[in-house]
């Protein structure tokens, strides 16, 4: 249909594998990897950008949860800025090498994994970043992991289009990046079972934290609900006065409700999960 785009990779076996680089120098490696993925996202979005397919992406999560019986359930109300595009799909360590501080990608294509995992054609560029985060969780030493994750995310933002890397696009209340890390963890588990391989413990450890992440998101939404109630009350009070149910003196409640609403909304925003 005239929409095919080919990526050509320099795939020589130079430098060191990503898995080793993430152990030796995780922060510098994550900076280079984030910048590379951001550049790819920019090129991909210039060539292809489709509307948000929230239902398709969430339906796929449900299928994997049902098949894997993970005892987890997570859906995201993706922001309008989350758009489908061309992605790398399977960001595995054997596909990535680090050469003189730069990143070389090789051997990345759909193939068997695309069939087994039933991935949709157009996926958000942030899904590649989620896959990269999974690699950091797998290989990076724990004492440097948080800094490495932050560096990876910030370097991706520095190169990716602003439309898909803005604060709104990364809003943790809507799933942000975390939902794509979750998806990648399910992908890894499904491929391990399909190939009769031993499942990696880091996937189990991360999935065990899902309920904690969701609980924090629920608590934050409680503040949002309270803010909405205050804003609604600030509208209802003047209406009640117009209909004769309240006196003029009681109108002092309006600024009080408005002030409380703004304060609670700020608390809600402040409690948003870190993008990284």
Where are these regions (language model features)?
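Cytosolic-side membrane-insertion boundary helix
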Residues: 208-234
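ATP-dependent phospho-/nucleotidyl transfer catalytic cores
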Residues: 6-93, 97-105, 111-127, 131, ...
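Generic long, charged, amphipathic alpha-helical segments
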Residues: 153-166
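Short, flexible coil/linker elements and helix-boundary hinge sites characteristic
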Residues: 25, 47-48, 144, 221, ...
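Transmembrane alpha-helical hairpins and terminal membrane-anchor modules
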Residues: 229-274
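Short beta-strand micro-motifs within the conserved protein kinase catalytic domain, predominantly
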Residues: 1-2
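A detector of tandemly repeated sequence units and domain arrays
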Residues: 165-168, 173
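Alpha-helical transmembrane segments of integral membrane proteins
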Residues: 175-179, 224-228, 249-252
